[in-house]
Amino acid sequence: MPVSPSSVSVLPPTSLEQILRIRAERNQRTPKCARCRNHGTTSALKGHKRYCQWKDCMCAKCTLIAERQRVMAAQVALRRQQSQEERDARDLEVLLGSAGNANDLLDILRLDAGEHHGKNHASPTTNNNNNTEEKYEDSQGQRSSPSSPTGSETVVSTSSPPELSSESTPNTSGSVIPTSPVFKPNGYSSMPMFNPVYGRPFMRFPMFSVMPHFFGTPSMSDFASAASLAAPPAFFSAQPTIATSSPSTIFPQTAPLDYSHRLMKNEEAEEEYRENDKTF
């Protein structure tokens, strides 16, 4: 009994190829592998590109397909670039308010980016040479005139305090030697240290005769008001004031008088001066 074609189509598929063929017939827009089609077979492209048995074929048809795919990919990349440039131009039009200026600015930015990229590739050797020349010039200037600051040292911010000057920065050379035995910031007078720990020499041994330059800190003269604290160091005595209230030959008192003793001494001097005025 002959089987009609209508009954064949009604029969369920018996193999995977029939199932794939039926699905391909139902959905005609499913992309197919072009290499497999060139070689007489039909296979869906989804998930098939890696496992295609003709993916490395170098025949004329497959080579033409590969070239066509390359051209299409380049066209897609070009369209994406053009659309991105159009979006940038629209954004610049919103900012600048004119289409011509936006396009010109896009061209200028593109040219500047290309020139900057080329300079970055060509400039490392020149930058290194310039840096070495500048370092050599700075070292020569510091050797010739240690007391005169170089160009990099003279740039000091106006908002910074005087103690952050170029002489106290760690970048300066070691040939710059401070004039005073104990380093003091420029612009400030030497203030007294009322803390006995800082006002005494090491271990309180009589070392003034051995190393007088270590204890050459000028002491404060007698003062009665806070305004005399700002007096310049020229009015201070050169020798430190030594307390003799507890004399000792082994451990002499080498610390200067503290603030309270100075005030008491100053008050006694004022009373004596008033008494002398009354008598005269």
UniProtKB/Swiss-Prot annotation:
Residues 33-80 bind DNA. InterPro entries: DM_DNA-bd, DM_DNA-bd_sf, DMRT. Residues 157-173 have a biased composition (Low complexity). It is found in: Nucleus. Its main location: nucleus. It comes from the Eukaryota. This is Doublesex- and mab-3-related transcription factor dmd-5. GO terms for molecular function: DNA-binding transcription factor activity, RNA polymerase II-specific; metal ion binding; RNA polymerase II cis-regulatory region sequence-specific DNA binding. SMART domains: DM. Residues 141-156 have a biased composition (Polar residues). GO terms for cellular component: nucleus. One of its GO terms (biological process) is regulation of transcription by RNA polymerase II. Keywords: DNA-binding, Metal-binding, Nucleus, Transcription, Transcription regulation, Zinc. Dimorphically expressed in the dimorphically connected interneuron AVG; expression is observed in the AVG in males, but not in hermaphrodites. Changing residue 54 to R: In gk408945; alterations in AVG interneuron synaptic wiring. Suppresses the ectopic synapses formed between PHB and AVG neurons when AVG is masculinized by cell-specific expression of fem-3 in hermaphrodites. Residues 116-182 are annotated as: Disordered.
